[in-house]
């Protein structure tokens, strides 16, 4: 396969997964208040685990940009938007470091990559919560405790949802994770 066809296929895959993440993010996902289950992370995690670090980083960036330009972002300031809608979704690409290039597919790298990526994403949301969202803290809660509670619970719920979906994908569709040139 020629290099240009490979690049077109890769770019198409990145664009598709970023668009899918954006579309999924339009589905209401609130558990309580600001606590969410962000299943929209799953396409970017899958992209990262299938195509590697760079593809995942770019996919996350496109997803974040789509959220901002379509008005589906809670933006308080440029620095908050940068942290929560560019850095945080881009960080999901770190799962690409756990990419498996050959079969048989092992579950442990998929789960570890997912855990690390979701942890990193919600770390950035935690920092943003302390800096930008502290005025919304529950009565008697400090900024750190509030942000840790909201983002910690959201991160755990998101990781669990991603684990469940990706375990099903690994068991039923393992070829999704192994890229081939065909």
From Swiss-Prot:
It is a multi-pass membrane protein. Its main location: membrane. Gene3D superfamilies: 1.10.1760.20. InterPro entries: Thia_Transptr_ThiT. The keyword Zinc does not apply. Keywords: Cell membrane, Membrane, Transmembrane, Transmembrane helix, Transport. GO terms for molecular function: thiamine transmembrane transporter activity. GO terms for cellular component: plasma membrane. Belongs to the vitamin uptake transporter (VUT/ECF) (TC 2.A.88) family. Thiamine transporter subfamily. Probably a thiamine-binding protein that interacts with the energy-coupling factor (ECF) ABC-transporter complex. Unlike classic ABC transporters this ECF transporter provides the energy necessary to transport a number of different substrates. The substrates themselves are bound by transmembrane, not extracytoplasmic soluble proteins. In E.coli forms a stable energy-coupling factor (ECF) transporter complex composed of 2 membrane-embedded substrate-binding protein (S component), 2 ATP-binding proteins (A and A' components) and 2 transmembrane proteins (T component), probably with a stoichiometry of 2:1:1:2. May be able to interact with more than 1 S component at a time. This is Thiamine transporter ThiT. It comes from Lactococcus lactis subsp. cremoris (strain MG1363).
């Amino acid at each position: 396969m020629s290099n240009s066809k490979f690049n077109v296929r890769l770019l198409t895959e990145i664009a598709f997964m970023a668009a899918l993440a954006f579309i999924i993010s339009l589905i209401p996902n609130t558990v309580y208040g600001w606590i969410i289950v962000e299943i929209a992370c799953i396409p970017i995690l899958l992209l990262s685990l299938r195509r590697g670090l760079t593809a995942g980083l770019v996919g996350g960036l496109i997803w974040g940009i789509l959220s901002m330009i379509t008005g589906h972002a809670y933006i308080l300031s440029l620095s908050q938007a940068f942290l929560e809608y560019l850095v945080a979704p881009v960080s999901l690409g770190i799962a690409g470091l756990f990419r498996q290039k050959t079969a048989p597919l092992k579950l442990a790298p998929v789960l570890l990559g997912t855990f690390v990526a979701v942890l990193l994403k919600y770390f950035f949301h935690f920092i943003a919560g302390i800096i930008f969202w502290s005025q919304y803290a529950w009565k008697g809660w400090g900024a750190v405790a509030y942000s840790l509670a909201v983002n910690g619970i959201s991160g755990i719920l998101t990781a669990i949802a991603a684990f469940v979906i990706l375990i099903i994908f690994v068991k039923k569709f393992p070829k999704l994770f192994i890229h081939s040139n065909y």
